Each structure stands twice: as structure tokens, then as C-alpha cells.
Regions:
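Acidic, low-complexity terminal tails and accessory targeting/binding regions
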Residues: 10-17, 60-63, 96-118, 159, ...
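Active-site-proximal alpha-helix that buttresses catalytic centers in soluble enzyme cores
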Residues: 16-97, 185
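Cofactor-binding loop segments of dinucleotide-utilizing enzymes, especially the Rossmann-like FAD-
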Residues: 22, 100, 168
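Short, active-site-adjacent cap segments at secondary-structure transitions
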Residues: 26, 80-81, 104, 171-173
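Phosphate-handling substructures
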Residues: 26-30, 34-48, 90-149
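Glycine-rich phosphate-binding loop signature in dinucleotide/nucleotide-binding domains
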Residues: 65-68, 157-161
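His/acidic metal-ligating clusters that form di-metal
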Residues: 149-152, 157-158, 165-170
């Protein structure tokens, strides 16, 4: 996997972030339950990786640019944690779990827990370029809120020069220009905090 560099315009100390999107998740065990709706919303975050997702995570763990990193920080969501585990085993780096590096929140009010509602919220999010429209039936997390959540949390790691962050595509897209980010894709960027 190649590590390309993206520069960001944020003020303060320079930090190199090696973003890794989590491996392919396996929601099938949740979907096959007698009451799958019991695992809607954040419940879906309990799903592990598929076999293919594990294989890809083990492969990406050998990425050369990881040798520059000082620590690994992972979203607390299972698919990211499992991916980060393989990177930690391969690199020997300490793994920190960060609950605020989670995926985009399609529901800030706790009202749209079914898949259809999440898809509608996502449609509005895309239609309004990450802003919350007045006509949206759901209050979802905006791009600005995601960026703020991430940067506020990143503050406590500001003494590190290079870190690996295993997280989610929509969060990564707040800081890198890639429209599509594949499972286990590695994107290196530099920011100032």
C-alpha cells in the first residue's frame, strides 16, 4: 500500500497522521438474528471483520510507512479495533483506543435507528455537502462537527510527531481529498494542531 502525503491548513504543532480505514466488516451474524433490529444503530458497530477483511488487515499491517509511527490510535468500533490489532501485532506499537474517532453519526437525536432512516440522513448529508439542511427530517453529524470532534480529541496526542489512526471512511474524508476510500486503504497526511 502506498503512503501519499496530504497537507492540511490547521494551526499549531505539526503532526503526521497515517490514516488507515478499517477492514471489511461482517454484518451477517447481526442480520441473521431473530430480532436484527436489536442491533441497529451503534449495535452494528459490534460486527467483526470478514475473513477477507482480516486477511487484508494482516497484509496492510506490513506497510512500510508504519515504521515511522510512534503509536496507533483506533476508533473503539470493533471493525477498526480488529484492524488496529493486526497493525499493533506487526509493528509492536502501543495501541490506544479512542471512542471519539468513530464513524459519522447519522442520528444525533436517537430517532432514526432503522437502515432506511440512516440512508435518508446520508442522502441529505451528501446533497448538502456535509451541512445540515433546514428541511432534513433527521439531525445528523455535519462535516464541521466531525472535524471538530476529531481535532479536539487529537489535542491530547499533540506531543507525538507521527501516529497511525485506524478509523472510518467518512471521518477520513474530512481531512483527505479522496472521495472513495477502500477498506484498509492507507493515506498519510500532515496537519498542524
Amino acid at each position: 500500500m502506498a503512503c501519499g502525503l496530504v497537507a492540511l491548513e490547521v494551526q499549531g504543532n505539526k503532526m503526521k497522521i497515517i490514516f488507515v480505514r478499517h477492514g471489511e466488516p461482517d454484518y451477517s451474524m447481526l442480520d441473521k438474528l431473530e430480532n436484527p433490529q436489536l442491533y441497529s444503530g451503534f449495535g452494528r458497530d459490534l460486527a467483526p471483520l470478514t475473513g477477507k477483511g482480516r486477511s487484508l488487515a494482516k497484509e496492510v499491517a506490513k506497510t512500510v510507512c508504519f515504521g515511522k509511527a510512534e503509536i496507533i490510535i483506533s476508533s473503539s468500533v470493533t471493525r477498526a479495533l480488529e484492524t488496529a490489532h493486526y497493525i499493533a501485532v506487526e509493528t509492536g506499537l502501543d495501541l490506544f483506543v479512542e471512542p471519539f474517532f468513530h464513524e459519522w453519526r447519522p442520528d444525533l437525536d436517537g430517532t432514526n435507528s432503522d437502515l432506511t432512516s440512516v440512508l435518508v440522513a446520508h442522502e441529505y448529508y451528501l446533497k448538502h455537502q456535509g451541512a445540515l439542511s433546514e428541511d432534513s427530517p433527521y439531525r445528523y453529524e455535519t462535516d464541521l462537527e466531525m472535524r471538530h470532534r476529531f481535532l479536539r480529541t487529537l489535542e491530547k496526542y499533540k506531543n507525538y510527531k507521527t501516529i497511525i489512526i485506524v478509523t472510518h471512511g467518512m471521518l477520513m474524508r474530512q481531512f483527505v481529498p479522496d472521495e472513495k476510500i477502500d477498506f484498509c486503504q492507507v493515506i498519510e497526511c500532515e496537519i498542524e494542531i
